Design a protein with these regions (language model features):
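Generic low-complexity, intrinsically disordered sequence content enriched
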Residues: 10, 15-18, 59, 91-95
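Enrichment for repetitive, rod-forming helical segments
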Residues: 10-11, 44, 80, 88
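Amphipathic alpha-helical interaction modules
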Residues: 17-60
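Amphipathic alpha-helical binding modules
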Residues: 65-100
């Protein structure tokens, strides 16, 4: 398994964990571990590309912030999940292009 596949696998697991923790409800979770892990995986994914131009340049680190309001927490987790899935898509397409 190459680095790209490992990152994709880890991103999928992070998405699954964020989904399950969000189902607990009432905001009894922290957003920080999810943002922190996403940022680390994003940094690793960037090393797979020659430059940060193009689509990889559209990704930004997610602030490691933990609001008190449950609705705000849900918005942050949803944003993280969107970024996770977009990054997975980019990595999968880049993998397909590399194999052709």
């Amino acid at each position: 398994m190459d680095k790209r596949e490992l990152i994709i696998h880890m991103l999928r697991q992070l998405d699954e964990q964020s989904r399950s923790i969000q189902q607990i409800g009432a905001g009894y979770y922290s957003c920080v571990p999810f943002a922190r892990r996403f940022n680390k995986l994003l940094a690793e994914a960037r090393t797979l590309f020659e430059t940060s131009d193009g689509l990889m340049g559209t990704f930004e680190e997610i602030p490691e912030f933990d609001p008190k309001d449950p609705a705000d927490k849900m918005k942050i987790i949803q944003g993280i999940r969107v970024e996770i899935n977009q990054l997975i898509s980019l990595l999968e397409v880049a993998e397909e292009d590399a194999s052709q």
